[in-house]
Swiss-Prot record:
The active site is at residue 305. SMART domains: TOP1Ac, TOP1Bc, TOPRIM. This is DNA topoisomerase 3. InterPro entries: Topo_IA, Topo_IA_2, Topo_IA_AS, Topo_IA_cen, Topo_IA_cen_sub1, Topo_IA_cen_sub2, Topo_IA_cen_sub3, Topo_IA_core_domain. Residues 2-135 form the Toprim domain. NCBIfam families: PRK07726.1 (NF005829), topB (TIGR01056). The record marks 60, 167, 175, 307 as: Interaction with DNA. It is an enzyme of class 5 (isomerase). GO terms for cellular component: cytoplasmic replication fork. Mg(2+) binds at residues 8, 104. Residues 186-191 are annotated as: Interaction with DNA. GO terms for biological process: DNA recombination; DNA repair; DNA topological change. Releases the supercoiling and torsional tension of DNA, which is introduced during the DNA replication and transcription, by transiently cleaving and rejoining one strand of the DNA duplex. Introduces a single-strand break via transesterification at a target site in duplex DNA. The scissile phosphodiester is attacked by the catalytic tyrosine of the enzyme, resulting in the formation of a DNA-(5'-phosphotyrosyl)-enzyme intermediate and the expulsion of a 3'-OH DNA strand. The free DNA strand then undergoes passage around the unbroken strand, thus removing DNA supercoils.
Length: 711
C-alpha cells in the first residue's frame, strides 16, 4: 500500500519526487516504493457557472437575478480535465491507503486540494504537508512532521465559504449592473473599494490648494538654528518683525544635550513590501514581481514561499541561519557574510516572533547557493533585494547620537539638531561613509553673535498620486485612505491585512487596468470616467472596504472553529438580495464616454472604442452582442530602421504597419520581409507569433464572471 501525495503544480510535484527519491515517471505522476506524487495545475475544480445550474442563465437578464443556488455545485475545469482524470484514478486506486495534501500551505492551497478530493468522493484518510520552501531539506523535514488532515478542516471551510460568497455576490452584482445599464461593468468586494481608494486620493489632489508659509533661522558659526514655532507662520511680516527684534542682538546657549539612539533595518520582506520595493527601485509592476518570485521559489529554489503577509521568522528557524548565509557567499556581499557566519544568533533577536507568523514566515533566502549566471536580470534583482534585507536584519543596529542644542535670543527660542553616527551597523552593507562630528563645540551658557538671519519660504504640497507600489500598500491599509464611520472596522482591516490578500492584490490592480476603471500615466494611477461611474452606480456597501472587514472577521473565526460557515453563506445570500434590489430600483443612467459613430455590423448599435494591453479596438455597446474589431494593436514586428515594435492598423490586405519613427509597411511588404529574413521558410505558427494575432477585449467582465471570478 502506498501514500498518494497531491501537489499544487507539476514543478512542486517533481521537487517532492526528487526529495523522496521517487524515480518511476508516468503520465501525470511519479511513483516510488512508498509514495506516488501527482499534481493539480492550479485549480482542477471550480464553482459551476450560472448556466450549468440552468441553461436559461446563459442569457444575462435582470429579471433572473439574484441567482442563488440552493446548493453550490463544482465542476471540473475543461482544459485540465485530463489531469483531473489521472488524479481521480490515483485517489481511487486500491493500492493507495491515504492522501497527503501537499498544495500551498494556506487558505487557497487547502481549497485546491479539498475541492478535488470532494469531487472524487474520497473516503481515505488525509494527512497534510505544511512547508514554507520547496528545497530538498525542507520537504524531507516536512514529511517527518506530517499533520492530520482534520486539523485543517476549519481552514478548508473558511476557504470554501470565501469562494462561494465571492461567487454569489460577484456574479449577481456584475450581472445586475451590466444588464441594468447595458454596459460591460464589473463589481467586487475588493476591486470596487480599490477604485474608491484611488478616487479619494485623486479628489484630494484635485481639491488641494497650496498655501505658503514661512520659517526663520539664524546662523551661528556656520550652523543653522531654527526658530521654535508654536504655529505655522502664513504671514511673512510676522517673521520680519521678529527678525527686526533679534538683529544685532547677543544670544545664549541654554542647553547642549546628547542622546544615544539605535535603529534596526527595515523588517524582513512580506510580499507587499517586496512588491513596493521592486517598483521603487526597478519600476517592476506587482504582477511582474510576483511572477519573478515564483520562478525564484519553484524553479531555482533560492527563496522561501512568496505569498506571505508576515515580516517575521519562527523561533525554530534560528538554527537555519548559518546555512542560508553560506548560500549568499555567492554574491558580492561575501565579506559581510563571512563576518556574520562567525557570529551566533539567538531566537531573542527582533526578527523572530512566533505570534506574528500565521501560515508562512517572511521571504528570505534558502540554503541553496545561487548560480548567478543562470538567473535572468529580473530574478537577480529580486534575489538581491531579499538577500540584502536578510543580511541587514542580521547585522548590528545603526548606533547614533542625537545632539540637541537649545539657544535663546531676546524672547525667542532656537534649536539645532544634529545626527552623529557612532556605529554604522547594518548601514555598512550599502553605506561606507565615515562618522560625522561637529566642528564647533557648543557649550551651555556660551554667548554668541548671529552671523546671518534668513526667512525661508515654503509651500504645502498635495499628496502624491498612487503608483502600482503604493496602491498595494494602500490596499493593505485602506483605513488610512478612506473615511470609515465606525472606527472598529478600521481596527479589523488593520488586523486582517486590508482588502484582498497578498496573493490576489496584484491581479486585482491588473484587472482594474484591463477593464478601463483605472489608468496609469507616467506612473500616476487615476480613475477613468468609467471607474467614476462604477462608483456612482454601485450600492455604497460595495464601494467601502467595510464589507471586506466584516467578511474577513468572520472568515478568521471560521478558521478558528468559532463561527459557522453555513451561517456566513446565508448572510451573504441575504446581502446579495439587498444589493441586486438596490441596483434594480436605481434611476441613474450610464454614459459611455468613448462612444463612436461607427455602427456595429451585427446589431447596428454604435460601437465603443476601448483600450487593450496591445492597442485599441471597437466593441459593440450591447453586452449581449459581443461584436468586436481591432483598430490598432502593438505587434512583435520590429521596424527595420529603429528596431522598435510596430503598430498594426486594419486587417487583411488593407493592413498597414507603422512605427513611431515614421516608417510604414503594407501587409504584403511585411510578408515579403518576413520571407526574406528566413529564406522563405516561415511556419504558420511563427507568423502568428510574429504579428501577435491574438484579439482580446481586455475590459470584458463576462469571462471573469462566468469562469473563475476573483474579487
Amino acid at each position: 500500500m502506498k501514500s498518494l501525495i497531491l501537489a499544487e503544480k507539476p514543478s512542486v510535484g517533481r521537487d517532492i519526487a526528487n526529495a523522496l527519491n521517487l524515480q518511476q515517471k508516468s503520465n501525470g505522476y511519479i511513483e516510488g516504493k512508498q509514495y506516488i506524487v501527482t499534481w493539480a495545475l492550479g485549480h482542477l475544480v471550480t464553482n459551476a457557472t450560472p448556466e450549468q445550474y440552468n441553461p436559461s442563465y446563459k442569457e444575462w437578464n435582470l429579471e433572473d437575478l439574484p441567482i442563488i443556488p440552493k446548493k453550490m455545485k463544482t465542476v471540473v475545469i475543461s482544459k485540465t480535465n485530463r489531469q483531473f482524470k489521472i488524479v481521480k484514478s490515483l485517489i481511487l486506486d486500491k493500492n493507495v491507503k491515504e492522501i497527503i495534501i501537499a498544495t500551498d500551505a494556506g487558505r487557497e492551497g487547502e481549497l485546491v486540494a479539498r475541492l478535488i478530493l470532494d469531487k472524487v468522493g474520497n473516503k481515505k484518510p488525509i494527512k497534510r504537508l505544511w512547508i514554507s520552501s520547496v528545497t530538498k531539506k525542507a520537504i524531507q523535514e516536512g514529511f517527518k512532521q506530517l499533520k492530520n488532515g482534520n486539523a485543517y478542516q476549519n481552514l478548508y471551510e473558511a476557504a470554501l465559504a470565501r469562494s462561494e460568497a465571492d461567487w454569489i455576490v460577484g456574479i449577481n452584482a456584475t450581472r445586475a449592473l451590466t444588464t441594468k445599464y447595458d454596459a460591460q461593468l464589473s463589481l467586487g468586494r475588493v476591486q470596487t473599494p480599490t477604485i474608491q481608494i484611488v478616487k479619494s486620493r485623486q479628489d484630494e489632489i484635485n481639491y488641494f490648494k497650496p498655501e505658503k508659509y514661512y520659517t526663520l533661522s539664524i546662523n551661528v558659526d556656520g550652523y543653522d538654528l531654527n526658530l521654535k514655532q508654536q504655529k505655522r507662520y502664513k504671514d511673512k511680516k510676522e517673521l520680519e518683525l521678529i527678525e527686526h527684534k533679534i538683529k544685532h542682538q547677543e544670544g545664549k546657549i541654554l542647553e547642549v544635550k546628547g542622546k544615544n539612539k539605535k535603529s534596526y533595518a527595515q523588517p524582513l520582506f512580506n510580499l507587499t513590501d517586496l512588491q513596493q520595493e521592486a517598483y521603487k527601485h526597478y519600476k517592476m509592476g506587482p504582477k511582474e514581481t510576483l511572477n519573478t518570485l515564483q520562478h525564484l521559489y519553484e524553479r531555482h529554489k533560492l527563496v522561501t514561499y512568496p505569498r506571505t503577509d508576515s515580516n517575521y521568522l519562527t523561533d525554530d528557524m534560528v538554527d537555519t541561519i548559518q546555512e542560508r548565509l553560506r548560500a549568499i557567499l555567492a554574491t558580492d556581499y561575501k565579506s559581510h557574510v563571512r563576518d556574520l557566519i562567525s557570529e551566533s544568533f539567538s531566537s531573542k533577536m527582533h526578527i523572530f516572533n512566533n505570534q506574528k507568523v500565521s501560515d508562512h514566515h517572511a521571504i528570505i533566502p534558502t540554503e541553496v547557493r545561487p548560480s548567478i549566471e543562470q538567473l535572468s536580470q529580473r530574478e537577480f534583482k529580486i534575489y538581491m533585494l531579499i538577500a540584502e534585507r536578510f543580511l541587514e536584519n542580521l547585522m548590528n543596529p545603526y548606533l547614533y547620537e542625537v545632539l540637541t542644542i537649545h539657544a535663546q535670543l531676546k524672547d525667542y527660542n532656537f534649536v539645532l539638531k544634529e545626527i552623529i553616527p557612532k556605529q554604522l551597523g547594518y548601514k555598512a552593507l550599502k553605506d561606507q561613509t565615515s562618522s560625522h562630528t561637529l566642528t564647533h563645540s557648543f557649550k551651555e551658557g556660551q554667548l554668541f553673535k548671529v552671523h546671518r538671519i534668513e526667512i525661508h519660504e515654503h509651500e504645502t504640497k498635495a499628496p502624491e498620486y498612487f503608483n502600482e507600489g503604493s496602491l498595494l500598500k494602500a490596499m493593505e491599509n485602506p483605513q488610512n485612505h478612506i473615511d470609515l464611520n465606525d472606527k472598529k472596522y478600521a481596527k479589523t482591516l488593520k488586523h486582517s491585512g486590508g482588502i484582498g490578500t497578498v496573493a490576489t492584490r496584484a491581479d486585482i490592480i491588473e484587472k482594474l487596468f484591463n477593464m478601463n476603471a483605472l489608468e496609469s500615466r507616467d506612473g500616476k494611477i487615476k480613475v477613468t470616467s468609467k471607474g467614476k461611474q462604477i462608483l456612482e452606480l454601485s450600492p455604497s456597501e460595495l464601494t467601502s472596504p467595510i464589507l471586506t472587514a466584516q467578511w474577513e472577521e468572520k472568515l478568521m473565526l471560521i478558521e478558528k472553529g468559532k463561527y459557522n460557515s453555513q451561517k456566513f453563506i446565508q448572510e451573504m445570500k441575504n446581502f446579495t438580495f439587498k444589493v441586486v434590489n438596490k441596483i434594480k430600483s436605481s434611476e441613474q443612467k450610464y454614459k459611455h464616454d468613448n462612444l463612436t459613430t461607427t455602427e456595429c455590423p451585427t446589431c447596428g448599435k454604435f460601437m465603443i472604442k476601448v483600450k487593450t494591453k496591445n492597442g485599441q479596438m471597437l466593441v459593440c455597446q450591447d453586452p449581449k452582442c459581443k461584436t468586436k474589431k481591432n483598430i490598432q494593436r502593438k505587434t512583435n514586428a520590429r521596424c527595420p530602421y529603429c528596431k522598435k515594435k510596430m503598430t498594426l492598423f486594419g486587417k487583411g490586405k488593407e493592413a498597414v504597419y507603422r512605427c513611431v519613427c515614421g516608417h510604414t509597411e503594407t501587409q504584403s511588404q511585411m510578408d515579403k520581409r518576413m520571407r526574406d529574413k528566413t529564406n522563405g521558410k516561415v511556419s504558420r505558427k511563427e507568423m502568428k507569433k510574429y504579428i501577435n494575432k491574438k484579439e482580446e477585449i481586455d475590459n470584458n467582465p463576462f469571462k471573469d464572471a462566468l469562469k473563475n471570478l476573483k474579487l
